[in-house]
């Protein structure tokens, strides 16, 4: 007996992450980026109300990354709550309605991307046209993303 009494359309899940052509492949035979996308498809089984994604675009080429960003937006617009961890500030700023910045395991700031930029980006912003979340991270933590 299954835990959930729902049919899962694996074709649809694989299609969402652009892996339909790999439907017969064993996970160990997939590239790193394909394995990453496969793990997202697995996380979508049974349509969770909350989706946890840990560094979901690590190892993805630029096209696959943007395709996954589109999927995350689509899922969120359909009402799914998504908790995303990332070191990619562009990704956080692009996908997240709210951002929590952690430093050494402590929450140092949490707000909308725009409010974080308004409150914490250095003046004048280091970005050519406006401040960004990376400027905020640097201002709040005092170190770069890889320090």
What would you call each of these model-derived segments?
Residues 110-111:
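ABC ATPase "signature
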Residues 51-54:
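Catalytic Walker B motif of ABC-type/P-loop ATPase nucleotide-binding domains
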Residues 47:
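Conserved catalytic motifs of ABC-family nucleotide-binding domains
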Residues 26-30:
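Conserved ABC ATPase signature
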Residues 40:
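Hydrophobic anchor residue at the start of the ABC signature
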Residues 2-22:
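Conserved ABC ATPase "signature" region
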